Amino acid sequence: MAAPLALVLVVAVTVRAALFRSSLAEFISERVEVVSPLSSWKRVVEGLSLLDLGVSPYSGAVFHETPLIIYLFHFLIDYAELVFMITDALTAIALYFAIQDFNKVVFKKQKLLLELDQYAPDVAELIRTPMEMRYIPLKVALFYLLNPYTILSCVAKSTCAINNTLIAFFILTTIKGSVFLSAIFLALATYQTLYPVTLFAPGLLYLLQRQYIPVKVKSKAFWIFSWEYAMMYIGSLVVIVCLSFFLLSSWDFIPAVYGFILSVPDLTPNIGLFWYFFAEMFEHFSLFFVCVFQINVFFYTVPLAIKLKEHPIFFMFIQIAIISIFKSYPTVGDVALYMAFFPVWNHLYRFLRNVFVLTCIIVVCSLLFPVLWHLWIYAGSANSNFFYAITLTFNVGQILLISDYFYAFLRREYYLTHGLYLTAKDGTEAMLVLK
């Protein structure tokens, strides 16, 4: 499989290199769908200029990236395009090997359950085969590298790509069972954009499975391992934050980065749900509604952990999607990361109810973003309501699509144990309904 992956990487790099050299690069780098106040390359350049002048990059209200990022590009500014292409390639490679290992685990678990006669007798068509799973890692790499969202994000030099790489390596190290490296990469991802802290739960659940430790409140081994992983994660995060302080000799980055993410002071339009509401809202209501909006990212973690404790990788997929929808400053690069996982769940396709309609909604909205932006900002024949309407439709489409995958996953799991052909007590055919 190395040759096909190498071919995909070559094609992806070629496409990016061609776009970097085209006149479109400048246009893409200014698109509000592709960059946000957090991830904009122009803001990174501004921060670097301030740093070169001996001024704190956080002294103004422009730069909101982490200190490690600004020091990374302080040395690699001349190779920025190459850095972003390598970043995308590393993300795809990490996802490739992560899913390759995950498929092996899935197949072994399926084989064991078949031997233990845990599946219903009429579900042979739901059983996954090695041939069916063989090309899934390559498809994942393909879905990530050649996704237009990923390409646009790379060409715009959005720092969202770096966050995607950190999350991809967190997934890889978690699936490999490396507790320490998993904690480090999760800490780096949290340090970068804060929201990946919610991935702690699925990461812990998967590592518990790898260690054959039951997820039981009364289990001593469960609490010991959870404490160890939490301490590794928190310790790594503290070390990274302290390193940032030593680089800048200042704590200014904490309110400038994390305060900015949580308080949402910059209402530049984007593909998220925050900007329009807070632009229209009275100032004295804003704190309450900021809390209401922010809690969405964290609120679903506990119920999902309870429902999907036996399926932590699917839980991780859902949680990444929730982050990309409900974070304060989302971009299409965030959407591209969870979309890369669609081939992993191709066995759910038969149970998806509205996938065609929802895919059309997402594609059409993606095409209408620049049209309605032009009508609003340049032509003056539309207003912010038009742009926010398409943004809202785009996010509703994503929410319904992820809900559809969640329903399909639960439905397949139920059929595996209860059989495909369900009957009611009176012998008539029954229908499975999610409540």
UniProtKB/Swiss-Prot annotation:
Extract the InterPro entries matched here: PIG-U
Q: Where in the cell is it found?
A: Endoplasmic reticulum membrane
Question: Which Gene Ontology terms cover its molecular function?
Answer: GPI anchor binding; GPI-anchor transamidase activity
**Which annotated residues bind a cardiolipin?**
216, 309
Instruction: State where it is primarily located.
Output: endoplasmic reticulum
TM regions (residue ranges): 4-22, 79-99, 137-158, 159-178, 179-194, 195-205, 223-244, 287-306, 312-331, 332-345, 355-372, 385-406
Family per record: Belongs to the PIGU family.
Name of the protein in question: GPI-anchor transamidase component PIGU
Q: Which organism does this sequence originate in? A: Cricetulus griseus (Chinese hamster)
